[in-house]
Amino acid sequence: MTAHKLTPILNVSNLAESFRWFEKLGWEKGWDWGEPPTFGGVCSGHCEIFLCEGAQGGRGHGGVKGTFGPDGDETSDKGAWMSIWVDDVDAVHRRCVEQGLEVAWPPTDMPWGVREMHVRHPDGHVFRISRAIG
Protein backbone atom coordinates (compact mmCIF):
# COMPACT_ATOMS: atom_id res chain seq x y z
CA MET A 1 0.00 0.00 0.00
CA THR A 2 1.16 3.50 -0.83
CA ALA A 3 -0.64 6.29 1.01
CA HIS A 4 -1.16 9.54 -0.88
CA LYS A 5 -2.63 11.67 1.88
CA LEU A 6 -3.72 11.37 5.51
CA THR A 7 -6.53 13.46 6.94
CA PRO A 8 -7.33 13.08 10.63
CA ILE A 9 -10.95 13.30 11.76
CA LEU A 10 -11.55 14.85 15.18
CA ASN A 11 -14.71 14.32 17.19
CA VAL A 12 -15.85 17.75 18.44
CA SER A 13 -18.72 18.80 20.67
CA ASN A 14 -19.55 21.96 18.69
CA LEU A 15 -18.52 22.39 15.05
CA ALA A 16 -19.00 26.17 14.93
CA GLU A 17 -16.95 26.70 18.10
CA SER A 18 -14.22 24.43 16.74
CA PHE A 19 -14.05 26.46 13.53
CA ARG A 20 -13.58 29.61 15.64
CA TRP A 21 -10.89 27.91 17.79
CA PHE A 22 -8.89 26.86 14.72
CA GLU A 23 -9.20 30.37 13.27
CA LYS A 24 -7.59 31.69 16.48
CA LEU A 25 -4.77 29.20 15.89
CA GLY A 26 -4.34 30.62 12.37
CA TRP A 27 -6.16 27.95 10.34
CA GLU A 28 -9.03 28.63 7.92
CA LYS A 29 -12.44 27.03 7.64
CA GLY A 30 -12.35 25.02 4.44
CA TRP A 31 -15.92 23.73 4.20
CA ASP A 32 -18.87 22.36 6.11
CA TRP A 33 -21.61 19.86 5.33
CA GLY A 34 -25.14 19.18 6.56
CA GLU A 35 -28.10 21.28 7.63
CA PRO A 36 -27.26 22.27 10.25
CA PRO A 37 -23.58 21.51 9.59
CA THR A 38 -22.13 18.62 11.59
CA PHE A 39 -19.05 17.86 9.49
CA GLY A 40 -16.38 20.14 8.09
CA GLY A 41 -12.74 20.82 7.54
CA VAL A 42 -10.07 23.34 8.49
CA CYS A 43 -6.97 24.04 6.40
CA SER A 44 -3.47 25.47 6.80
CA GLY A 45 -1.02 25.30 3.92
CA HIS A 46 -1.21 21.76 2.51
CA CYS A 47 -2.72 20.35 5.73
CA GLU A 48 -6.37 19.63 6.44
CA ILE A 49 -8.21 18.32 9.50
CA PHE A 50 -11.79 17.06 9.34
CA LEU A 51 -14.11 17.91 12.25
CA CYS A 52 -17.15 15.78 13.06
CA GLU A 53 -19.67 16.93 15.64
CA GLY A 54 -20.50 14.14 18.07
CA ALA A 55 -19.27 11.19 15.99
CA GLN A 56 -16.23 9.43 14.52
CA GLY A 57 -13.87 9.00 17.44
CA GLY A 58 -13.66 10.20 21.00
CA ARG A 59 -12.61 13.38 22.67
CA GLY A 60 -10.99 14.34 25.92
CA HIS A 61 -12.33 16.59 28.60
CA GLY A 62 -10.02 19.62 28.29
CA GLY A 63 -8.79 21.58 31.28
CA VAL A 64 -6.65 18.77 32.70
CA LYS A 65 -3.04 18.71 33.90
CA GLY A 66 -0.08 19.67 31.77
CA THR A 67 0.96 17.20 29.09
CA PHE A 68 4.65 16.85 30.01
CA GLY A 69 6.88 17.47 33.01
CA PRO A 70 6.79 16.28 36.61
CA ASP A 71 3.09 17.12 37.02
CA GLY A 72 2.12 16.02 33.53
CA ASP A 73 -0.22 13.20 32.71
CA GLU A 74 -0.27 12.17 29.06
CA THR A 75 -3.00 9.62 29.76
CA SER A 76 -5.36 12.00 31.54
CA ASP A 77 -6.62 13.35 28.25
CA LYS A 78 -8.40 10.96 25.89
CA GLY A 79 -8.50 13.28 22.89
CA ALA A 80 -6.33 12.75 19.82
CA TRP A 81 -2.71 13.96 19.73
CA MET A 82 -1.20 15.37 16.52
CA SER A 83 2.11 16.94 15.57
CA ILE A 84 2.00 20.05 13.42
CA TRP A 85 5.36 21.09 11.97
CA VAL A 86 5.87 24.85 11.62
CA ASP A 87 8.67 27.33 10.87
CA ASP A 88 8.42 29.27 14.16
CA VAL A 89 7.12 27.59 17.33
CA ASP A 90 7.56 30.77 19.37
CA ALA A 91 5.41 32.80 16.96
CA VAL A 92 2.65 30.19 17.27
CA HIS A 93 3.00 30.35 21.06
CA ARG A 94 2.62 34.14 21.03
CA ARG A 95 -0.49 33.84 18.86
CA CYS A 96 -2.00 31.21 21.18
CA VAL A 97 -1.41 33.38 24.24
CA GLU A 98 -2.82 36.47 22.50
CA GLN A 99 -5.91 34.52 21.39
CA GLY A 100 -6.48 32.97 24.84
CA LEU A 101 -5.89 29.37 23.76
CA GLU A 102 -4.84 26.80 26.38
CA VAL A 103 -1.10 26.19 26.16
CA ALA A 104 -0.49 22.87 27.92
CA TRP A 105 3.31 22.91 27.46
CA PRO A 106 5.37 26.04 26.64
CA PRO A 107 7.95 26.15 23.85
CA THR A 108 10.82 23.91 24.96
CA ASP A 109 13.92 22.50 23.28
CA MET A 110 13.48 18.76 23.70
CA PRO A 111 16.36 16.25 23.93
CA TRP A 112 15.24 14.52 20.72
CA GLY A 113 16.14 17.58 18.62
CA VAL A 114 12.77 19.29 18.39
CA ARG A 115 11.48 22.59 19.77
CA GLU A 116 7.85 22.06 20.63
CA MET A 117 4.85 23.35 22.51
CA HIS A 118 1.43 21.84 23.16
CA VAL A 119 -1.91 23.57 22.70
CA ARG A 120 -5.15 21.91 23.79
CA HIS A 121 -8.47 22.13 21.93
CA PRO A 122 -11.55 22.59 24.18
CA ASP A 123 -12.56 18.96 23.48
CA GLY A 124 -9.20 17.71 24.79
CA HIS A 125 -7.33 17.16 21.53
CA VAL A 126 -3.63 18.08 21.89
CA PHE A 127 -1.55 19.61 19.11
CA ARG A 128 2.23 19.32 19.36
CA ILE A 129 3.51 22.40 17.53
CA SER A 130 7.07 21.49 16.49
CA ARG A 131 10.14 22.31 14.45
CA ALA A 132 13.46 20.53 14.15
CA ILE A 133 16.45 22.17 15.87
CA GLY A 134 20.18 21.64 15.75
Where in this protein do the model-derived segments appear?
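Vicinal oxygen chelate
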Residues: 1-9, 24-120, 130-134
